[in-house]
Amino acid sequence: MKTLPLAVPHMSQDEAEEVFGWILDGEASEEEIARFLLAMTERSETADEIAGAARALRDRLIPVEAPEGAVDCCGTGGDGHHTLNVSTAVSLVVAAAGVPVAKHGNRAASSKSGAADTLEALGLDMEAVGRTAEKTLAEIGICFLFAKNHHPAMGRIQPIRQRLGKRTIFNLMGPLSNPAGVKRQLIGIARPGYVPIYAEAKAKLGTERTYIVSGDEGLDELSLAGGNELADVCGNEFEMRRVYAEMIGLPHAPVEAIRGGDAAHNAMALKALLEGTPGPYRDAVVFNAAATLMAAGAVEDWEVGAAMAVESLDSGKANELLGKWIEMAV
């Protein structure tokens, strides 16, 4: 067994990769891992540490094949707002608009309902979803890459994360370790001031284009409630900008307007959204879908992306896609 450092000093990329290799391989005790993760959270992780830890996770994942141009849309979680599942809905909207989506996600660690919980409540068999991931991605343009199926080492970590009940570096590592190796993403993080650091970590790992976003309220997605930080990461560089829902004609709405509940509640809201229910949840999904389509290179203008997302919903394509997915994932 390895002994993790008590003081948790700042680490280089290589050092972080080595230490998180120990953690993922079960070479440290649960008590040491919990203490180590909390200490890192309290002092804030550096870009080198996030990139190195993500490299360790990537080295141990079980990959899947994905078509060229596949994207992912996910949040780090841990924002404490317990909103409805925006990125899950965005994945269906974007895929129905013609961009393949390799959605990477997990069950809730510190929230009430993660992507896997909500999809299961919608009628998807999680075991079948994993078994048919490459098939559904190739044939209907969407799959769900359940973290536990592709990151076996995370099985040892999940109980620790659930016991801690708060955000850790593992929230940050997951979106950087998509098993389909997507080169384009929308990633939401829960700390707006941390966007440049996370963008630097993503730039160290490389990407064709990734948008790192955070709502000013600490929301791990683009928010309707105010301003949003956005880092546009291309290759190994990034630039920062501010974006607002109003710039594409979407109305302001408080975070409380998209407050969620348990998996059954969130699944019901998502189904209603796909069936045409208007309101702040739909607006939040359109805003984030527009950003995902921009990052994917499918559109070059936010308003065009929003219109594409609206068409995906209003035409019934996103709802039809969910039905096909449920039928295929058996």
UniProtKB/Swiss-Prot annotation:
GO biological process: L-tryptophan biosynthetic process
InterPro entries reported in the protein's UniProt record: Anthranilate_Pribosyl_Tfrase, Glycosyl_Trfase_fam3, Glycosyl_Trfase_fam3_N_dom, Glycosyl_Trfase_fam3_N_dom_sf, Nuc_phospho_transferase
Catalytic activity: N-(5-phospho-beta-D-ribosyl)anthranilate + diphosphate = 5-phospho-alpha-D-ribose 1-diphosphate + anthranilate
Enzyme class: transferase
Cofactor requirements of the protein: Mg(2+)
Free-text function comment from the UniProt entry: Catalyzes the transfer of the phosphoribosyl group of 5-phosphorylribose-1-pyrophosphate (PRPP) to anthranilate to yield N-(5'-phosphoribosyl)-anthranilate (PRA).
Protein name: Anthranilate phosphoribosyltransferase
Taxonomic lineage from the root: Bacteria, Pseudomonadati, Pseudomonadota, Alphaproteobacteria, Sphingomonadales
Name of the gene: trpD
